[in-house]
Amino acid sequence: PERYDVIVFKNPNDGKQNYIKRLIGLPGDNLLIENGDIYVMDEVDGEYEKSITRKPPEKLKNVLQAVDDTNHIGELLNDVQWPSRWQAFDGSKQWTTDATGENPVFRSSAQPDAHWLRYRHYQPFKNEWSTISSGLLPTRFRNNSLPPGRLIGDQYGYNDGVYQNNEALVSTQNLGLHWVGDLGLEFWVDIKSSDGTLMFDVVEGGVHFVCEIDIATGKATLSAQDEASKTKVTFQDASGNPVESPSAKTKINGSGSHHIMYVNADDRLNLWIDNNYVEFDAAAFTWDGIPIPTYSADDPGDAEPAGIAAKNAELDITRIKVLRDLYYTSVKGQGPLGSQISTENETGESISIIEAYHRDPESWSSDGAADFFTAKKGQTEPMFRLEKGETPDKDQFLPMGDNSPRSLDGRVWDGEKFVERDMLIGRAMLIYWPHTLNKPIKYFPNFSRMGFIK
């Protein structure tokens, strides 16, 4: 099997039980989980050198988690006129919003300068839901006040609503305990002009990862604008050589409608146009330090972590989704549900401190925030060592679940943290009976979730 395949295997602690997880570690690997990513550490002259592992594009595409979708805004939020998360926060008139239809349409007029439509992660606080449920907008948004956005965390929608005796054991916000810097942008655009420039970006650690597409020629160019960041980024080609301005040819050729997905994951930029993967001459990159969130009034950075702009081009954006990569946690939680759920983050800080940093961009420049966001980063020793067996059937593999905060996988098993090859059953191929919908009748099949596993 290959890394990031979904595999079925016998539970090492109960040979009668089959497990299904994603394969993360291979025989001979020294593994490190850091910043939500998976690293392999090779020993050189008595010291370990780490290299990030990268999900193949099609596997990456299928594990991305939805953060926001302009076509799916909660009814309660609409009722209180919750502020749009997508706005021209700089006050530019280049962008207008048509809200007359079922879903908003964002329109850009043709202007010589690029003004950005940007995203702020306006997530209701736990104590605001009672106000919203009573039909009122929380006070922080009244009088046309628009505070900075909060950080995007590793929240999983299918972990929401963990209850016992009608009491919430873990609130929604408590299931997003780690800042996720690996973000993506998916949007549907109708380009009205035959030339001009379409631009979009995602931000991590204050670095704007910008993609510019020449509408007339289809040439796409990447850049890492890291002036406001505490770390610097270098693009590298497949041979490890630095590349200043990576580029690629796309199928965009003048006016037309397109579906675009742009994702920063595993220290690589990924672009799909109309479901076709775009190959750049260099899309992988390295950091010269540890990325931490940045914010200033001039450049909100990670408080506005995604954006779309146009220059000398008229276009309509009919739908926008904000996405995030999986975040693999390296802690064994001791929450109210036992080891299956983590109510701490990797710093060991309390939920109140974590929440305070996540929601307050002004605090990100403090020494305390720097210590918080770099805690358990820059480690020099692997966490898991997997052996090649004396015979192939004893080779060791490490499986992990995509729902990392609640996955009972190799990270948290008692005893050995691996599966031997002779316990592997095979690759998972098909979801043939997902959890039923129970409507319009009980046990009604969920046909939309049936399909091949990637």
Regions found by a protein language model. Give the residues of each.
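Extended hydrophobic leader/signal-anchor segments used for secretion and membrane insertion
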Residues: P1-K454
